[in-house]
C-alpha cells in the first residue's frame, strides 16, 4: 500500500503533536517533584550544572551510578538555562521536559510509520487473514479507507495507556528509555520494509538507548528482531539488510566512550554499582525488595492497555496466529505464513516486540511496572491495526472482533461507574501522609467529572461502532484525552498539595532558620525532595532505633561533599525534620528539642547534639548497633 500524500502526513503529524502537547506539556512544571525517585534524578542533573561535572551524576554529595548519563544531560541542559530557578521554581519543568518530549516523539513515530506504510485490515481478519504467497493487496483506498485516522489512533492508543500517562510526565529515565528503544525498533522495521531507509538510524538510536539505561537495550532489540525473523522466515537476507556488524560498531561508538571514561575515573566503584548491581543483579536477583511472581507482567499487560485490553488480546492472537506456533514444534508452515511481504508485516512485528518484552522481563528476578513501558508502543500498534476491521464485510460478521469491541466499551463503562461510585470507596482510602485526601477528593468534584468523560467515551464508542473503522476507536479515545486536563492533572495537583507541599515548606523553613554550618537531617519518612528543595546535603535515617544511633555518629564522623563532621563542642545543634509518627516513639522522647516549624505531618526540630549522643549511647548499650558503615549497594 502506498504512503499517504505529504500534505496529509504533515496535517496528521501536526495534530498528533498538538494532542501530545495537551497530554504531556499542559501544566508541566505546575506541581512539585514526586518522592522518592524523581527528586534524585532532578537533584543529580542540577548538581551536574552546579559542580561542572558532566561525567558522573552526584546526589546529596555522593556519586550516583544507577543510570547512564543521557537523561541527566538533557535535564542538566535545561537547568543550565538562564534564570531557570526563577521561572521554574519547583524544578519539575526542567526535569520533566525530556520525559514529555520523548513520549511525544514516540507518538509521532508511530503515526508517521502508519502514514508511510498503511497496513490493510485483512491482515488481522479472522480465519487466517494472511495474503496468499507473494500477494500484496491492491487498491490502497479500498483496503484501508482511513489510514490517516488509524495513524492518529495508534498515537493516542500509546499516549492514553495508564502507564504512559504517569511516566510521560515524571523526571526519571523510563520515558526516555522507552522512546529510544521504541524509535530504534520502529527504525529497524522501516529498514526491513524499505531498503531505501537509512541503515544507520536504528543503530544510532540503539546507542542512545544504551546511554539511557544500559546494555539491556541491546538485549531487548536483539530479542525482538530474533523472534520476528524466526516467525517471518528468510532471516538471512533480512538480517543482511540491517547490517548488524557495522551497526553494532556504530552503537558502540555512540555509547562506549562514556562507559570507558566512567570506568577509568571511578574504577571499581562504578563497576560494582552500575554493572554489578544495577544491571546484572537486577536480572539475576531481587533488588530493593521488588519480588514479584513470575506472572507479574500479565496483569500489568492488561492494565496498561485499558480500556481496550480485549482489542489488544485479539490482535496479539491474530498477529502471531496459531499457525505460527507450528514452527516452535518443528512443523512446516504454510507458504503464506512465511511469505508475508516485509512492508505488510507491522502487526506481526509489533506482536514479536510485545512478546519479547514480556518474555525477557518475566525471566528477570526483579520486576517493576515500569519495565513494561517499552512494550506499550507495540500494544498501541496492535490496537490501532485491529480496530481497522469493519463492523460488517463481504466475508460476514467477525464475531470475535465485535465481542472484543463490546468488552472494551464495557470496561470503559465500568470505569465510569467506579468513578461515579467514588463516595462509596474513596472514604476507605487510608494514606497516612495525606489524611484529608478522601474528603478533599470528593469535595473537588473531579471524580464526577471523570465519570462523565468515561461514560461519554463508552457511549460514543457504541453509537459509532458501525461507522468507518478508525472513527469508532477515535470516538472512544477523544473523551479520554479530555479526561487528562479535566480530571487527572487536577487530581495530581491535589495530591502534590497534600503530600509534596509540606516537604517543600520544611525545606524552606530549614533554609531560613539554619545557623551557619548547622547540619540538616531527616528521620522516619524519607523524602529526597527535602534535599532538592533545600539545596543542602541531608542526612537520612529510618524509623528504627538504629536510625537515631546512626544519626548521632554520622554528625560526628561522616565526611561527604557538603557535609563536614564535627563534635558537639564545635556544632552543638542539628536541624531534624521528623514526622509525627516517628516523633512519638519512646527513644525520641525526652530530648527537649526546639520546634521551629511544622507543616502537615512534619516537624522541624533543633536538637541538642550532646543529648542526642547520650541517647544514642543508651540505645547502643541496649543492643542497637551502628549500621550506617555497613556496605550498601546504593545510598543517598
Feature names for model-found ranges:
Residues 1-126, 130-399, 598-601, 605, ...:
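Membrane-integral, polyisoprenol-dependent glycosyltransferases
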Residues 2-3, 200, 318-636:
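Membrane-embedded architecture of ER/inner-membrane glycosylation machinery
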Amino acid at each position: 500500500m502506498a504512503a499517504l500524500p505529504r500534505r496529509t502526513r504533515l496535517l496528521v503529524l501536526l495534530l498528533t503533536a498538538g494532542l501530545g502537547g495537551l497530554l504531556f506539556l499542559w501544566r508541566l512544571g505546575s506541581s512539585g517533584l514526586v518522592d522518592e525517585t524523581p527528586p534524585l534524578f532532578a537533584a543529580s542533573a542540577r548538581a551536574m550544572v552546579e559542580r561542572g561535572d558532566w561525567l558522573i551524576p552526584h546526589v546529596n554529595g555522593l556519586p550516583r551510578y544507577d543510570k547512564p548519563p543521557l537523561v541527566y544531560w538533557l535535564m542538566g541542559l535545561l537547568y543550565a538555562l538562564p534564570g531557570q530557578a526563577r521561572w521554574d521554581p519547583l524544578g519539575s519543568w526542567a526535569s520533566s521536559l525530556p520525559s514529555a518530549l520523548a513520549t511525544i516523539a514516540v507518538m509521532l513515530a508511530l503515526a508517521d510509520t502508519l502514514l508511510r506504510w498503511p497496513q490493510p485490515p485483512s491482515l488481522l481478519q479472522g480465519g487466517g487473514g494472511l495474503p496468499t504467497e507473494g500477494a500484496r493487496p491492491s487498491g490502497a483506498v479500498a483496503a484501508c479507507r482511513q489510514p490517516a485516522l488509524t495513524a492518529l489512533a495508534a498515537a493516542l492508543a500509546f499516549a492514553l495507556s495508564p502507564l504512559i500517562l504517569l511516566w510521560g510526565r515524571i523526571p526519571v529515565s523510563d520515558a526516555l528509555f522507552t522512546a529510544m528503544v521504541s524509535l530504534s525498533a520502529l527504525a529497524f522495521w522501516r529498514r526491513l520494509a524499505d531498503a531505501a531507509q537509512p541503515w544507520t538510524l536504528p543503530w544510532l538510536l540503539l546507542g542512545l538507548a544504551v546511554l539511557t539505561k544500559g546494555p539491556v537495550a541491546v538485549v531487548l532489540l536483539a530479542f525482538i528482531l530474533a523472534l520476528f525473523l524466526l516467525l517471518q522466515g528468510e532471516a538471512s537476507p533480512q538480517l543482511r539488510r540491517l547490517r548488524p556488524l557495522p551497526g553494532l560498531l556504530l552503537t558502540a561508538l555512540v555509547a562506549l566512550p562514556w562507559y570507558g571514561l566512567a570506568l577509568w575515573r571511578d574504577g571499581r566503584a562504578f563497576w560494582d554499582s552500575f554493572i554489578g548491581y544495577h544491571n546484572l543483579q537486577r536480572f539475576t536477583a531481587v533488588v530493593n525488595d521488588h519480588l514479584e511472581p513470575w506472572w507479574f507482567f500479565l496483569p500489568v499487560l492488561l492494565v496498561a492497555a485499558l480500556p481496550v485490553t480485549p482489542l489488544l488480546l485479539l490482535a496479539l492472537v491474530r498477529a502471531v496466529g496459531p499457525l505460527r506456533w507450528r514452527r516452535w514444534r518443528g512443523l512446516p508452515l504454510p507458504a503464506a505464513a512465511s511469505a508475508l511481504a516485509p512492508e505488510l508485516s507491522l502487526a506481526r512485528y509489533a506482536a514479536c516486540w510485545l512478546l519479547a518484552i514480556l518474555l525477557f522481563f518475566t525471566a528477570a528476578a526483579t520486576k517493576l511496572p515500569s519495565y513494561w513501558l517499552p512494550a506499550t508502543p507495540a500494544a498501541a500498534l496492535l490496537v490501532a491495526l485491529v480496530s481497522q476491521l469493519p463492523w460488517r464485510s463481504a466475508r460476514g460478521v467477525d464475531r470475535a472482533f465485535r465481542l472484543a469491541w463490546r468488552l472494551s466499551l464495557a470496561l470503559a463503562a465500568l470505569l465510569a461507574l467506579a468513578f461515579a461510585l467514588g463516595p462509596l470507596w474513596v472514604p476507605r482510602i487510608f494514606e497516612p501522609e495525606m489524611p484529608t485526601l478522601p474528603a478533599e477528593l470528593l469535595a473537588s468534584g473531579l471524580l464526577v467529572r471523570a465519570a462523565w468523560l468515561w461514560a461519554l467515551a463508552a457511549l460514543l464508542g457504541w453509537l459509532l461502532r458501525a461507522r468507518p473503522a478508525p472513527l469508532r476507536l477515535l470516538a472512544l479515545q477523544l473523551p479520554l484525552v479530555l479526561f487528562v486536563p479535566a480530571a487527572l492533572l487536577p487530581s495530581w495537583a491535589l495530591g502534590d498539595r497534600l503530600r509534596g507541599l509540606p516537604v517543600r515548606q520544611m525545606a524552606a523553613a530549614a533554609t531560613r532558620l539554619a545557623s551557619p554550618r548547622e547540619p540538616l537531617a531527616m528521620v522516619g519518612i524519607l523524602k529526597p525532595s527535602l534535599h532538592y528543595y533545600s539545596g543542602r546535603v541531608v542526612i537520612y535515617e529510618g524509623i528504627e532505633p538504629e536510625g537515631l544511633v546512626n544519626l548521632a555518629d554520622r554528625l560526628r564522623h561522616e565526611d561527604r561533599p557538603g557535609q563536614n563532621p564535627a563534635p558537639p563542642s564545635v556544632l552543638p545543634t542539628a536541624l531534624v525534620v521528623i514526622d509525627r509518627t516517628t516523633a512519638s516513639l519512646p527513644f525520641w522522647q525526652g530530648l527537649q528539642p526546639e520546634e521551629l516549624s511544622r507543616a502537615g505531618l512534619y516537624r522541624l526540630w533543633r536538637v541538642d547534639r550532646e543529648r542526642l549522643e547520650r541517647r544514642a549511647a543508651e540505645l547502643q548499650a541496649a543492643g542497637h548497633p551502628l549500621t550506617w558503615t555497613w556496605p550498601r549497594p546504593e545510598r543517598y
